[in-house]
Swiss-Prot record:
Subunit structure: Interacts with chaperone protein SpcS; this interaction maintains ExoT in a secretion competent state within the cytoplasm. Interacts with host YWHAB.
Organism of derivation: Pseudomonas aeruginosa (strain ATCC 15692 / DSM 22644 / CIP 104116 / JCM 14847 / LMG 12228 / 1C / PRS 101 / PAO1)
GO cellular component: extracellular region
Stated name of the protein: Exoenzyme T
Domain TR mART core span(s) in chain numbering: 242-418
Function according to Swiss-Prot or TrEMBL: Bifunctional effector protein that is secreted and delivered by the type III secretion system into eukaryotic target cells. ADP-ribosylates several eukaryotic proteins including CT10 regulator of kinase (Crk) proteins. In turn, induces atypical anoikis apoptosis by transforming Crk adaptor protein into a cytotoxin. Affects host cell morphology by disrupting the actin cytoskeleton. In addition to this activity, acts via its N-terminal region as a GTPase-activating protein (GAP) for host Rho GTPases including RhoA, Rac1, Cdc42 and Ras.
Localization, UniProt: Secreted
The keyword Secreted appears for this protein: yes
Residues annotated as transmembrane: none
Keywords tagged on the record: Glycosyltransferase, GTPase activation, Nucleotidyltransferase, Secreted, Toxin, Transferase, Virulence
Active site: R322, S346, E385
Catalytic activity of the protein: L-arginyl-[protein] + NAD(+) = N(omega)-(ADP-D-ribosyl)-L-arginyl-[protein] + nicotinamide + H(+)
Amino acid sequence: MHIQSSQQNPSFVAELSQAVAGRLGQVEARQVATPREAQQLAQRQEAPKGEGLLSRLGAALARPFVAIIEWLGKLLGSRAHAATQAPLSRQDAPPAASLSAAEIKQMMLQKALPLTLGGLGKASELATLTAERLAKDHTRLASGDGALRSLATALVGIRDGSRIEASRTQAARLLEQSVGGIALQQWGTAGGAASQHVLSASPEQLREIAVQLHAVMDKVALLRHAVESEVKGEPVDKALADGLVEHFGLEAEQYLGEHPDGPYSDAEVMALGLYTNGEYQHLNRSLRQGRELDAGQALIDRGMSAAFEKSGPAEQVVKTFRGTQGRDAFEAVKEGQVGHDAGYLSTSRDPGVARSFAGQGTITTLFGRSGIDVSEISIEGDEQEILYDKGTDMRVLLSAKDGQGVTRRVLEEATLGERSGHGEGLLDALDLATGTDRSGKPQEQDLRLRMRGLDLA
């Protein structure tokens, strides 16, 4: 209700008050003057929705980020700029007043994500860049809408604006990747360290830089698939599956639709299948040596990590076996201590499989609950493989050589708690009979290997 009032001089108010004074029943009543503050409050009008102070402050905070989007649109192309107009509509956006500055920034960066596709497109010429063109055109490539500048700008946009953690991580790694000893991001700036390096580099060094940029673009192509799927609103799994098929071809495609009722998606089945079908050697070598994964390895690693995140622990402790030759991740771990393998850990329910892999090396018995049964996915289904995630902590319960000189080791998942590997019913028939030497005399061996309950046969 809007109340209108007028201000009168004091004498008029006093006269009016006396004129209307009287009694209301037993109560004496008279008119009093309305305080000025009450009159001002009654005359106040609310601003229309969206035009209040908080809304104006929110709009002011958002303005710089809108300017960034417009700048990105001009840099990466008009088509990319047009693609962001619908997402920026006022109807779809939450009220600016309800968001913090950080939330507004993140929202604007996410709205700008489609622009990055234009930048990745402009960078495509780097896939065929020669040493001669690099030396001649670096300034052009690293300025304006040049390929190197567009690539660096697009990767920053993906790193800061993608909702997909894997895409953000991959973009960040690419920006930091060394090209000729200089981070890729710096190659997108003319006049800096990269420009100086190009001027002083030998022809052989320039050729090596060009080769490294070609390798970068292989990874960029896979990242672009993921961003395109995100912009279209497609599931993350589809982008990963498309990337695996593009990289591995029929080798990956053979797993499509093979396990429709299983717990894992097509992309996860592809990754697990490719790993067990020979890719485990290259992937684990890179993981254990701390090397950067190539594009194909990174895709498999993403798919396998997603499968492990989805899988839950087994209801009961599972006993499996592993055979290795040479040194392994647990060789230097003392009994009672915890260690882990930086790579994925393949084990089998069949001790015979472990013996065939071990030879005269090491046979390990493992007790755990977090392993994934990949026997139905692997082309080597008869190996009855149980696969543990990379970095799974294992406690060494026992490590000793038997009478034949084979190292026998017992591990349990650290999350199980101490002595879970000694549970009755799980450990049976050690059967490590003492061997004999050439003279026929019994060989000495660690007495602990005689304890029943550790099936290391």
